[in-house]
Amino acid sequence: MSSLNSVLPSNACAEIIEGKDKVHNVVILMHGLGDSHKSFANMAKNVPLPNTSYISLRGPYRLPLDFENPGGNWMWGEDVHFDQNGELQSEADFSKSFTMISNLIGNLLSYGILSSRIFFFGFGQGAMVALYSCYKLSTKYQLGGIFSFGGTLPLSITLPNHPFHVPVYLFEKRLHCSCSEYEESRLRKTFKPFHLTCWNRDDKTDMPSSPREWYTFVQSISKHLYIHNTLFEDAIPLTSF
């Protein structure tokens, strides 16, 4: 297989962290509102997974605010909205982001990656776009799963009659601090199986902030990864061990 650089759509800006071994799994990283792909790329280098490559995407729109981020300030939606408290809202028009992700998925399939081995790891608005994209693509593909750190479904979407079979893992620093009970119920009606993990802390963000919390993520995604055993020719599930 050639380099994964060939799968990037022409309008995508991303950093690829390729696995050392043959790639069977791809994790698409999607940063939060006002961040960039650089921070998630650095994170991926510290969380290597067997037979897995990361693609850290950058949001297609520049945020018209300066947070002095070395990688710039980017967002996934075309417009910016503020709530009644003056806080930035995550929900926006994600049409351009969805087209980019849809093209990326198609290119990964052409590259030889199975749809069930394509995963999303997103924070905040990035997680919302990941959930939105999987909602729209699940009638066409069987995707591997979504790891959402504080991200919820856009309220504008109509829930399906039956949940899509896409594993969703939602992580929060404290129960319902980022995802209300109503938003959780919408996720449960849209995807299954659904798993909720609460870090039970008030500081920092919904992202993992300790080795124990990172282990929880690795343990969760490992249930769905495929690794290649050098003693055999076939790829086997990590859960077979």
Curated annotation (Swiss-Prot):
GO terms for cellular component: cytoplasm; cytosol; nucleus. It holds the Pfam family Abhydrolase_2. Its EC number is 3.1.-.-. The keyword Iron does not apply. GO terms for molecular function: carboxylic ester hydrolase activity; palmitoyl-(protein) hydrolase activity. Keywords: Hydrolase. The keyword Secreted does not apply. PANTHER family: LYSOPHOSPHOLIPASE-RELATED (PTHR10655), PHOSPHOLIPASE_CARBOXYLESTERASE SUPERFAMILY (AFU_ORTHOLOGUE AFUA_5G09340) (PTHR10655:SF67). Belongs to the AB hydrolase superfamily. AB hydrolase 2 family. This is Uncharacterized hydrolase C9G1.08c.
